[in-house]
Amino acid sequence: MNRIKTLQELNLLDRFLFSEVMADNETLEDVLEIILGHHVPLKDKAQAEKELRRTPQNKSVYFDVYGEDIRDVAYDMEVQQKNTKDLPKRTRYYNGMIDLNMLHPGEDYSQLKDAYVIMIMPFDLFGEGKYKYTFHMSCDEIPGLKLHDGATRIFLNTHGTDDEGVSEELIQLLRYFEQTTEENAAGSHSQKIEKLQKRVEEIKTNEEVGIRYMNAFEEKMMERREGREEGLAEGRKEGLAEG
């Protein structure tokens, strides 16, 4: 079994630290501004581990960090350590869940607000060397014809090599996400990233956060143990049946 990282060892690509750090409006606004290239004034407190479920029968969704701006545009930001091979369809599902919870009965579809799903990953999902891949719906038959349905999905690659079309600040941010150190923050020459480092330091030295981290780890270990025990029990049943 892999050794548990201490809270001090976590990087921003680790979901626990990411959610704790980003559940702060000023921090999330700064990161969104670096990614999108414009200021995003949030209207309510950013939410970590926000759950959305339409019905008890539907698969629920837990957004790592969720926020809405003063124009009601929705932002879901995720970190993903491993390529699970389902990320394009997962982001489609996330986008759909945001839409389902946006309109009240009787409201017109034209009132559906824009929504962004942003995923940050330490691998190149599409193999093209880009730091940033942005997707919108468009027409196959007419190049350049956009659907303008308000849905945007962005995949950020910390291992990019092609800096065309992205800011140096975004490249430095992605580097900092993977190696969240004071040295990388200082070397970024970005006030926003240096401010982000201060937020990280506050979280890592917060006693209550440390307790939450240990509790989360213990719950995960318990789930794994229960899963192993269920697997062993099932294996014994199958063995008896075959015998």
Locations of regions flagged by a protein language model:
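Elongated, amphipathic alpha-helical interaction scaffolds
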Residues: 1-242
